[in-house]
Amino acid sequence: MALNLPPVVSEYFAAANTDDADRIAACFAADANVNDEKRDFLGRDAIRQWGSDSRKKYTFQSEPFEVEGPSQAPVVRAHVTGDFPGNPVDLTYRFTLVKNEIATLSIG
């Protein structure tokens, strides 16, 4: 069954499964915030660096399997596999979207 993800969220997951940090950053608003592993990354440049650093640290793939909530604030569950401690794991991605860009993303 295909999930009905907002286009920018679909693009985020596609980009996150590559080594292209520019593609990841392009999904976000200029002043966006990402919270991952209890750290905040503010703005596109920091998000680009986060995307790059994440790929240098681990190899992983995220596969969304559930989405809830309104289209401007989707909550997505994804199965993540890779070479990180605790592999595999199901994570929750909480998005806030503004004007077809990701304004906030919290991963946990």
Protein language model features and the residues they cover:
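Surface-exposed, charged secondary-structure patches
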Residues: 48-92
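Short beta-edge strand/loop motif at the mouth of beta-sheet-based domains
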Residues: 41-49
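A short gly/proline-enriched turn/hairpin at secondary-structure junctions
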Residues: 32-42
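Short beta-strand edge/turn micro-motifs at domain boundaries
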Residues: 90-108
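Short, low-complexity N-terminal intrinsically disordered segments enriched in polar/charged residues
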Residues: 1-18, 22, 26
